[in-house]
């Protein structure tokens, strides 16, 4: 019974990792993803772009199965630099990201009407 309980707990702790399987096709250097590549996850999420030391770095596009996407610059696995984030309903943020956060840019609705702005990371 003790072994069964330990196995059940182990399975429950590891199951989130088992369901997030990924497939990588691309370049490697020193055993890490470096250069151009594509990752596809079992949940439908997909990244196509550049890698450095195993992280998204440079230009790339991350798409979720629900239609959400980010296209632009990456640094250390986070949006950083110029990019566009689009939601499934068509709203989008266009501008600068800093360490994964909206920094200086504009949010538009699906008719390209300005909804709001971000200045130095603060929504106006």
Language-model regions: role of each:
Residues 5, 12-124:
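Glycine/tyrosine- and acidic-biased, solvent-exposed loop/turn segments at the edges of beta-strands
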